[in-house]
Amino acid sequence: MAQKPSLPDSEYHAWNPGLSSNLPTRLLPLITLFRSENSDVGYQQAKEAADFSGLPVEQLCALKVERLVAHEVLIRVTADLSVPDGPSYEYLGLQLRGMVDSIYRGYMVPEMQNIAVGFDLVRQRAKHELTLLVDEICSFDAPQKKPKSGFFGFLKRQPKPIDRTTKPPELEALEQLRQRVGNEDDFPAACMTALINVVSGILGKQGRIVTDRQLIVELALRVFCNDQGSAEIGHLIAPIFENAARAEGYRFLPAQSEPIVMNTKGASAAGKSTIRPQQRLLAERMGVPWEDFALISPDYWRKYLLDYDSLGVDYKYAAMLTGRELEFVDKKLDRYMAQKAKTKTVPHLLIDRFRFDSFKIDSEGDYKSTLLSRFGSTVFLFFAI
């Protein structure tokens, strides 16, 4: 059967977008987490590591310092600064990306060498911690069980051989490591968590621990640096960011003792942003300045993470190419807001994002909110259907 001729670009529309639901194989190396300007590890190398370790491929990129700095600037502009919101949908995104670009290029780039030196120290410390932990797991000696004997057991000529625990020693070591995580500070806890993820993945995929300890350390170090390493960079750039924002005349959002949260829920492309004018009117009726709200809409980050025009005819796949990195930054924003909650510096929040884990339950079936709404004193929920 002859295939239908492809439609010219002008004939594509919302119900016929001209793209498949899966990213074409040829475009996988263009995922932003693996592009050479962003990561020291390309897609193919990360895929091989994922096939070996059982971890998701996106966890095994190796983001460069410059990219991690960009993540931290993105979340700070979003959470800390008042971003002008105009009448059109595009205005907020243009303003946000412009502010991020001004701070990044004007203030972070000149300090990048110093930031890189600081991050290298973080990386060396993490590598040392991980090496010790890997040695601990690989040399772990499982506790022994003494053989049971009856009342007349001493009359037996030969004692029963000592039985070891039925669990493999590396699993026992992992369990003990998990129990220690909650008692550690952020840095060692993050090292432990990264290593637990890697070793668990390898055991699930290979059925045993590998003998190449250096490989385990390297994979765990990637996981650590992409996550906690970014938080450490956040500490390094905090004074630079504050000075930059003040020099540019940007307005810091005031902390609120009783934050108001407006949370818009709905599927991707459901039109959540179209509700914003009504939310603005609601704020006015409550006597709350709209400029005091942090406008959290991660979709506006996409065009900062990727130059759509560079894709040519493949520009329609831009959302897929940025999606995995967007999740990275989104989780970092959650962590940053949790830190602000501890220091009681949370502003009013307008949240416009779609999260699959919004109503996640734990292993015991209990609901535990992961939403930023949990930081609100008064919460308004809006649903776009």
Feature roles, as predicted:
Residues 1-241:
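Long, basic/Gly/Ser/Thr-rich N-terminal segments
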Residues 242-256:
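Pre-Walker A adenine-sensing motif
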Residues 256-262, 345-347:
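Pre-Walker A (Motif I) flank of P-loop NTPase domains
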Residues 258, 266-269, 323, 327:
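Intrinsic disorder
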Residues 262-286:
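Glycine-rich phosphate-binding P-loop
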Residues 288-376:
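Conserved nucleotide-sensing/catalytic segment adjacent to the nucleotide-binding pocket
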Residues 373-374, 382-385:
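Conserved catalytic-core segment of NTP-binding enzymes
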